[in-house]
Amino acid sequence: MPAIVSCLTTSYGRFGGQAAVEHLRAAGLESLELPIRTAGTGSPFGDEPLVTTDSSLADLKRVERLFDDHAIRIASCNVTSGNPLDRGVVAITKRKLELAHHLGVELVVGGAGEADELQSLAQLYRHLTEIGDYAAGLGITYCFETHPGICQNHHRMLETMNALEHPHLKLNFDTANILYYNEGVNGEIALAKVCHHVRHMHLKDSLGEYGQWHFPALGYGGAVDFVRVLEIMRPCGFNGPYSIEIEGLAGEGELSLKEHQRRIIDSVEQLQNCGYFD
């Protein structure tokens, strides 16, 4: 059975969501991961958001028409907003969950946060449980990013999952971030340890060097065994979304839309060769 393969719109760099909607089908995909941005905040990629926390019902209808016109579906939303230890981030996250629900999305990706002291960690857990309960009421599962903090590596992911035990708080495993944020980690072994908690994945390649910003088209980094990733996840009952994420290389200049599209096409071809579409 073919997996659900999508693409995070920031993979198109400064061309963003509009370009993703217009060009993904030509790259062989029909689904994407849509960021819902916090109004008034900039994007590190320089792209214009399709949806923000200030989006009106009319704005959402325009976005839905855009997707319908290009026969593209939203597989998930990215609702990253900051550290949920902050009460304000919880409120923003709830707003983003409401917007995702309006768009018919059942999976979102967002930060799990970080806390240095036991008292702060207990508060973070309470805030995440509140987010999970709110997501559950909307029929959504919130999937934690592989970012610094309580989901930085597989050890902390398991600790967090066991502490929360919430059916609507799960993991988004990022195949490159696990190497970028941790030294001496085997990414596929880490994935195997937590695969039963994974409900969403970011497929991202790298050189495998700790702290080195090098996230090219899939297959051009060499540190991630995408065949092995599929072999691990299929027996766990996971069939996607596998969301392609390409963040580029440190020091490279701005790419043209054609160059971004080439990276997406190359990534799709890599996954085809690895059996994701079989």
At which residue positions do the language-model features occur?
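A structural motif
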Residues: 29, 105, 198, 238-239
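Glycine-rich, proline-tolerant flexible connector loops at the mouths of alpha/beta enzymes
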Residues: 35-62, 115
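C-terminal helical cap(s) of enzyme catalytic domains, especially alpha/beta-barrels
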Residues: 256-278
